[in-house]
């Protein structure tokens, strides 16, 4: 298949994700800075974790918190030392992007994977405007890549460039018929690795259709939520929620075409009810894991978020 032009809804382009910085700039920072005193950082205390980073060790002084005694330095020097901390001035933000095969589906305007990349880019641009450090984790059946949070624009542009290249690589493979089986453990494994790279006090965005969600994912999300703030964007396509009117419809993977019958009104009603029930169950599971969530369709305008 010949590569489509930018903003086709199938392939990702650099300009498409870069332009979202203008939307982020128009809307302004999501969280306003506050003055919390001498040690105050830019955020209220709803952030999880200590929000402090190690600065140095010095000789223990009366009144120091005994919980902060640096036992290694104490043992090495023979004198009691205590750890000094400074409050983190920037919040780490991690963008977790699902590029597994189920995300490469779309019936209108764009693929779920394209919409996920767009909202991830927008959230990243907004974080940079707030002065936060932005990193990312993206994964598919063939790759898992991690980018440590940094506060400079060039680093974020490299992250976006990697998202574009990996996304378009999968599209290219699919159009050539190079299919891979989806592992039911892919999402859980990605979240397990996220737990090891996310710093306490981070804001973690997850962009996925959550088709791979299971009990193992629930465990990892719950552990993550103890020290970080989690926000999930559940990406869906209109055709997943509601079957089209009765008739025969062509569906294609870019190479082969199949015809499906949408059935009668009762069948379509069952179809919609099944989606709604599955979504309600997922929402409950995520809320129990202390994950705030938002639904996002492939036809939604991300600039309104």
Q: Which residue stretches match the model-derived regions?
A:
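Exposed, interaction-prone extracellular/peripheral surfaces
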Residues: 2-43, 59-64, 73, 82-118, ...
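N-terminal low-complexity, intrinsically disordered segments
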Residues: 67-77
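Conserved active-site region of classical short-chain dehydrogenase/reductase
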Residues: 121
């Amino acid at each position: 298949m010949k590569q489509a032009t930018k903003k086709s809804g199938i392939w990702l382009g650099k300009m498409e994700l870069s332009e979202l910085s203008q939307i982020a700039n128009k809307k302004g920072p999501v969280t306003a800075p506050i003055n919390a005193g001498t040690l105050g950082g830019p955020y209220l205390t709803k952030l999880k974790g200590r929000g402090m980073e190690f600065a140095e060790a010095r000789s223990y002084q009366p009144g120091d918190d005994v919980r902060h005694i640096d036992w290694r330095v104490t043992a090495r020097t023979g004198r009691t030392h205590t750890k000094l901390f400074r409050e983190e001035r920037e919040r780490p933000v991690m963008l977790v992007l699902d590029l597994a095969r189920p995300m490469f589906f779309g019936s209108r305007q764009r693929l779920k994977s394209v919409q996920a990349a767009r909202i991830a880019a927008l959230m990243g641009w907004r974080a940079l405007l707030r002065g936060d450090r932005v990193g990312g984790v993206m994964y598919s059946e063939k790759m898992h890549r991690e980018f440590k949070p940094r506060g400079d624009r060039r680093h974020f542009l490299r992250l976006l460039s990697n998202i574009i290249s990996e996304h378009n690589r999968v599209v290219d493979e699919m159009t050539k018929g190079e299919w891979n089986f989806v592992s039911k453990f892919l999402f859980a494994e990605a979240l397990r690795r996220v737990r090891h790279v996310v710093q306490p006090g981070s804001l973690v965005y997850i962009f996925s259709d959550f088709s791979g969600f299971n009990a193992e994912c629930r465990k990892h999300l719950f552990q993550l939520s103890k020290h970080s703030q989690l926000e999930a964007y559940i990406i869906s396509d209109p055709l997943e929620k509601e079957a089209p009117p009765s008739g025969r419809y062509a569906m294609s993977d870019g190479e082969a075409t199949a015809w499906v019958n949408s059935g009668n009104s009762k069948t379509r009603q069952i179809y919609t009810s099944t989606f709604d029930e599955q979504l309600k169950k997922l929402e409950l599971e995520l809320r129990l894991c202390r994950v705030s969530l938002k639904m996002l369709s492939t036809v939604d305008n991300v600039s309104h978020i």
